[in-house]
């Protein structure tokens, strides 16, 4: 749930392991 991935997912996918898309940013926990 925290935006600690430093990645955006405007296309709906995250490349960082363990991160999920909470549009428009990738989050972890």
Swiss-Prot record:
Key word Transit peptide present: no
Signal peptide: none
Cross-link Cyclopeptide (Gly-Asn), where in sequence: 1-29
Keyword Disulfide bond: yes
Record-annotated disulphide pairs: 5-19, 9-21, 14-26
UniProt entry keywords in alphabetical sequence: Disulfide bond, Plant defense
SUPFAM superfamilies: Cyclotides
A biological-process GO annotation: defense response
Domain of life: Eukaryota
Post-translational modifications: This is a cyclic peptide.
Protein family (similarity comment): Belongs to the cyclotide family. Moebius subfamily.
Biological role: Probably participates in a plant defense mechanism.
Domain notes: The presence of a 'disulfide through disulfide knot' structurally defines this protein as a knottin.
Protein name per UniProt: Cyclotide mobo-A
Organism this protein belongs to: Melicytus obovatus (Hymenanthera obovata)
